[in-house]
Amino acid sequence: MDDNEALNPSQRNVLEHLGAKLADRPFFSEQLQSELKEELSIRLSKFQDLIPKNETLFVSKFHLNQIMRCERQFVADRESQFEWSVPTARGLISHKAIELSVFWEREVEPLSLVDEALSRCASGDDALASWLYGLQDGDRSQLRSDVNNRVGTFLESWPPLKKEWRPMLEAPIRAEFAEGAIILSGKVDLSLGRPLGTTAGKVIVDFKTGNFYSSHREDLRFYALLESIRLGVPPRMVATYYLDRSEFSSEHITENVLESALFRVEDGVEKIVNILFKGTEPKMCSSEWCALCAHEDS
C-alpha cells in the first residue's frame, strides 16, 4: 500500500496544503538579508541611548502582542511574576512529546510520548522542573490529560513527520540590534523543509486551539522576519494550525509581508522603550474585552 493511501483525509490535507513543487517556490534577492538587517538596525538604533547600559531589552512575539493590544495590560503583566500552571505548561510539554514522536522507534502511542516528555522536563534544573516536582496528583493527572489530548489530536490529523522533511520543533531564533541592547527572539513550534540557494522552501507552523485572532498571523510574520535575517532566505509559507478543528490559516511570505513585520517591530519596540525607560504613561485601549481598561472606562 502507498504511504499516502494509509493516511486519513485530514492527514492528506496537511500534505497538500504545505507541499509545493520546486518550480512553484519563490526566490529572493541575495541582498535581502543585508537589506533587512540594515533597515532594522537603523530603525532600532535610535532607541539605544534610552536603554540603560547594563540592561538588555528582550522582545518576543508575546511582548509585541501585549504592547500592541493594550499598553496598560503590558505593564501589569510585566510587574506580575510568571508562575507555571497546567495551562502554561501543557503547550511546551505537548511540543516536546511531538518532537519525540519524530524519532520514536517503538509504536507511537500518545500517552507514552506524554510521559516521556514529562519525565524529561521534570529532570531539568529550571523552574518548570521544580514546579513539576511539587505537582499534586490531581494537577498532574489534569496535565497528562490535556497534553495527551493535544498530542493525540496532532498524531490523528498530521501525517508522520519524515526525517527527510527536516522537522525542527521548538527551535530558538534570535537577532540582536543596537549593539546588543535589543534582542528579538522566539521559538518556532515546527519548521519543515529548507531553502535551496535563494529559493524559499521552509514552512513554519504554529499550533493553536480555539478561535482565530489577527495576532496569530502577526506572530508568524515576526518569525518569518527573524528567519529571513538569520538565513537570508524567508520561509516559503507560514501557517497557524488549529488542532481542535484540523484547519490551517496560512500566508505566503513576500517582501511586502516582511516589511510589514519590520514596521510592527519598530512600532512595538518604540512603545515598550517609551513606557519602560522614558516614563511615558501607558495608554488605555478601546477594547471592550480588556479587563483593565473596560472596567475603568465604565
Task: Specify the residue positions occupied by each region the protein language model found.
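Metal-dependent nuclease catalytic regions and adjoining charged, substrate-binding loops involved
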Residues: 1-8, 16-19, 23-29, 48, ...
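C-terminal, charged and often intrinsically disordered regions of DNA end-processing helicases
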Residues: 1-90
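Anion-coordinating catalytic cores for phosphoryl-, nucleotidyl-, and glycosidic chemistry
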Residues: 41, 64-65, 173-177, 188, ...
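A residue-level signal for conserved active-site and pocket-lining positions in enzyme catalytic cores
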Residues: 70, 94-95, 190, 223, ...
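Hydrophobic (often cysteine-bearing) scaffold residues that line and stabilize catalytic clefts
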Residues: 86, 90, 94, 143, ...
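Short, amphipathic alpha-helical segments that act as regulatory/interfacial helices
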Residues: 91, 95-102, 224
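A non-catalytic, helix-rich entry segment at domain boundaries
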Residues: 97-172
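Mg2+/Mn2+-dependent nuclease catalytic core
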Residues: 171-263, 267
